[in-house]
Amino acid sequence: MSTKGGDPGASEATVAIGGSGLNQVVVALDTNERDSFERWCAFFGPRVGVLKVGLEAYVRWGPPAIESARRHARAIFLDLKLHDIPNTVAGAVRSARELDVDYLTIHAAGGPAMIAAAAEAADGRVALLAVTVLTHLDEPTLERLDMPGGSARRVLLWAHLARAAGAAGVVCSPLELAALRAAEPRPFRLVAPGIRPAGHGSGAGDDQRRTATAAAAIATGADLIVIGRPLTPAPDPEAALAALASELEDSARSARD
């Protein structure tokens, strides 16, 4: 595994993610510019819990993107959102397993058989996270897609199916965290993208709809929070990261008081 530190009570495919501060932060390395990718790896890797390599970087460079991130990261999150027939996804998981990543995403919509095949292929060496409802989908869009009951109902359903089929956790928007954590206690992991630090508005090109602050996501049950655009292209990444750390520490202090 790519982990530099671990939890003695955790499974082999788990990294230590508890506590306040930046251990629970996943930085999304979403770029196809190599200089930016390498710079982000070097800066964020030693400072946060996990680096995430997604489709943009992986399609551009393939496994070398993982190797670049691993040189700096405590843990690696490969975000490919695999979604195909069970045999094909199982083969892809076996290939990803050899890349020495800690987390790998699949789509919950692939169904129990696909998730179970992926879990068997993972063989405890990578934590499978089932993606539920993507954060750019708002309620009107879900209605147009003929998904009755809205995002919360579907996320809860898919999370239950994913856990029963062997997934280590799910990816969901911050808005579903509280209900999902009540229904699915730890060690089942909840990973929340759509994180916007306090004071960071939705800028031009921000296509995520179901969002929340980092502190709110942690307070309502997230184990990991995924942040990309508020951090990586920031004019002063160090200041942006310090502000995020302060937000999380203030929230943790308030929870203790």
Q: What are the roles of these predicted feature ranges?
A:
Residues 115-119, 231-256:
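C-terminal helical cap(s) of enzyme catalytic domains, especially alpha/beta-barrels
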Residues 2-39, 178, 182-185, 204, ...:
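N-terminal amphipathic alpha-helix/helix-capping segment at the start of soluble metabolic enzymes
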Residues 32-43, 86-94, 151-160, 208-216:
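Short, acidic/polar
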Residues 26, 49-52, 77, 105, ...:
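Conserved beta-strand positions in the central sheet of alpha/beta enzyme cores
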Residues 27, 51, 81, 104, ...:
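Conserved, mostly hydrophobic/aromatic
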Residues 101-112, 207-240:
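Glycine-rich phosphate-binding active-site loops on the catalytic face of alpha/beta enzymes
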Residues 21-22, 84-169, 173-178, 183-191, ...:
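Conserved anion-binding
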